[in-house]
Design a protein with these regions (language model features):
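Short, charge-rich amphipathic interface segments used for partner binding and complex assembly
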Residues: 8-52
Length: 52
């Protein structure tokens, strides 16, 4: 394998790793948003219970 071929393969691998990292970040943001919604729902339930 030539140096140019290795460089091309490494470049492609880095591109895929970067894309995977972005997908992981998006997934983490979605999980955090879901957790925030769940906490908000729990706070709402507690507030309703206290108001009753």
């Amino acid at each position: 394998m030539t140096r140019a071929e290795r460089t091309a393969l490494l470049s492609a691998a880095l591109t895929h790793l970067d894309a995977a990292a972005k997908l992981l970040e998006e997934a983490e943001e979605e999980v955090l948003a879901d957790e925030a919604r769940e906490l908000t729902d729990k706070v709402d339930v507690v507030a309703l219970a206290e108001a009753a």
